Amino acid sequence: MEQPQEETPEAREEEKEEVAMGDGAPELNGGPEHTLPSSSCADLSQNSSPSSLLDQLQMGCDGASGGSLNMECRVCGDKASGFHYGVHACEGCKGFFRRTIRMKLEYEKCDRICKIQKKNRNKCQYCRFQKCLALGMSHNAIRFGRMPEAEKRKLVAGLTASEGCQHNPQLADLKAFSKHIYNAYLKNFNMTKKKARSILTGKSSHNAPFVIHDIETLWQAEKGLVWKQLVNGLPPYNEISVHVFYRCQSTTVETVRELTEFAKNIPNFSSLFLNDQVTLLKYGVHEAIFAMLASIVNKDGLLVANGSGFVTHEFLRSLRKPFSDIIEPKFEFAVKFNALELDDSDLALFIAAIILCGDRPGLMNVPQVEAIQDTILRALEFHLQVNHPDSQYLFPKLLQKMADLRQLVTEHAQMMQWLKKTESETLLHPLLQEIYKDMY
């Protein structure tokens, strides 16, 4: 069996070569331990001290005067010295892997699957090398640089937040709160953004959605290729727009149900007066729906029927007025909202914040609602700082989006009232009538 070899001057020269090939990517190590100040979750923002590791990385600085990340070697558990060959590794395992690859060493096979730890890592080189490979270590990782800057900053933010949570119970509570909201989101919403984007980008294991781009393909979809609810036949051509509108209503009603169940899972929502719960849902569901609609939209159209179908933007534009006018503003909002690149964990908190707005008309206990929303907003701000360390102004941008959504829903409600007068034969679902009544 090949015996372990210690680092040599030649190996140290190879290390210099590795750094050069990695375009000078900085090591993720530093000086004294740095923890998140306990004063506020906002300390992770751009207002942090310029000497913090997070600020250093945001400014693109390689050196760090403070802030050890305390990363463990993925192979043996020793303290990692940096990101080597694609994983965090200590100097010993980095050198071991480099020698094995460059000298093309072969070790005596071992079938015991030895546990590799710092104290015994030199005992079984075969299992040590196999673990390196299993973790994804590769000599090619050097040629592509080391850790991407965006990934590195996200990692640093997460680790810094984790350290902050250990020293600040309030931050730990916010983290647990965020996780609870996210789990409620995953539990109650059938179509997540992750699922929608995988379908839209063709990465889903499911069949590609059936594309509806004209009356003929709509008819095929109605015959059972897309929707589970079958119809006897399509209406006359001039009523196609009404038929599509009914389909939209059906989806909206189902989403209102999902939002109601989601709201029940928001801590302290169910302790509110029942009238306040109804009021919050009445004014909040459409804002939430239009925010979530962006997840299933791209520039070419939107997913329908739980991802089984895709209606093109051009087909929706071809509908007669006022139905085409109803849909277009939602598309415009979706494109801008998608540019923020939120994920489902962000959306979960954003949707919760929309529902728990203390300035809704007719609330009986405003302070109680505001207290819940304040917790949600603090959790959202902290979560965004960790999840999007490169986007310093994402939180205020989302607050602006909440205002934009309110305006969008106000215009939508007015359009529904106008539709009720001008399209007398077009029926609104009873639940939606209740929501729109005296809304704005």
From Swiss-Prot:
Tissues/organs with expression: Heart, adrenal and intestine.
NR C4-type Zn finger ranges: 73-93, 110-132
Coiled coil start-end: none
Keyword NADP: no
One Pfam family, short name: Hormone_recep
Gene Ontology BP terms: adipose tissue development; apoptotic signaling pathway; axon ensheathment; cell differentiation; cell population proliferation; cell-substrate adhesion; cellular response to hypoxia; cellular response to lipopolysaccharide
Primary location class: nucleus
Compartments (UniProt record): Nucleus
Lineage top rank: taxon: Eukaryota
Ribosomal protein listed as a keyword: no
GO cellular component: chromatin; nucleus
A Gene Ontology molecular function term of the record: sequence-specific double-stranded DNA binding
The entry's DNA-binding region: 70-144
Subunit structure: Heterodimer with the retinoid X receptor. Interacts (via domain NR LBD) with CRY1 and CRY2 in a ligand-dependent manner.
Family label: Belongs to the nuclear hormone receptor family. NR1 subfamily.
Protein name per its UniProtKB record: Peroxisome proliferator-activated receptor delta
